[in-house]
Amino acid sequence: MKKILLFTTILLAFLSMGFAKSAGKKSVAVFVPGIIDDSPTYNMLVQGVKAAVEEKNQSLAKKNKIDLFIMEAGTNQAEWGPKITALCAERKYDVIISSNPSLPDLVEPILKTFPNQKFILLDATKEGNQNIHTVCYNQYEQSYLTGFIGGLMSKSHKLALIAAQEYPVMNNIIYPYFEKGAKAANSSSTVDFRIVGNWYDATKGAEIADAVAKKGVDVILPICGGASQGVITSAVNNKIYITWFDDNGFAKAPGTIISSSVMEQKKMSYNVTKEFLEGKTPWATAKMVGIKEGFVDFVQDDPNYIKTVPEDIRKKMANLLADIRAGKVEIK
């Protein structure tokens, strides 16, 4: 009996040592809902996480260095759920970090099967789930600024927003505040809201852009991933304007793109990864960052912006941006 107890004690001690070793070693996965090379947003996501992990690993012993895995899921949204499920099923990632407004609704059902999995989701909003922390960029500001310059530049006073799909941030913030900004610039402005149905179909994006152009729309905001390239092609062919979201897009079509509102995705992905590795992630919370915090900006110094947009309109944009940054104007 004593031998059995001794063996059991040794076995438990051995197992606990193994578990302690596993507990001391963290593993991070980055889920890219798209293609890294095709998306500055996802490239910044990956670079920020990498930087935080590499920085932390410099202070860790080899056996405790953090493992980093990057899954490039592609643009077919129907495959995102199964691929996230596969990551969760491996049960080895302490956190899965990603970025897309549609992801909270996608991961919540998956968490019913994998209740211990943690997610940090950027460019998204979700409160109240202990397994999820989200950070969104102030898209009230982004959308309003984009709509404001669109309203100033439009000669027909007809604008369009072409989205990949409908989701809460799109329906409740981006679309209404894009319209609000356009009407603030010119009360006669109208916004035609169209849906592609996915994040990759450039042909359909072009078809929708052609259709709204025929109705007199002369400024389009595309938020549809890879389908945005089709919208740009159509805009160039129809000699109308594009307002751009999330990164500096002026080089994509000089003379056609009139604005770029940018978000500091690399800096934010670095911050949330570092926060997680330090055990400081505020789970179940949703954070918003904007112009005052230095995570949202409106590009004013690009040569193509200066060349394409008249000086009087650039001055109006500069004044509005300065007022927001100083707290004189709050967009909400």
Tell what function each PLM region has.
Residues 21-332:
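A residue-level marker of the well-folded mature domains of exported/periplasmic proteins
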Residues 1-27:
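Short, low-complexity disordered leader/linker segments with a strong preference
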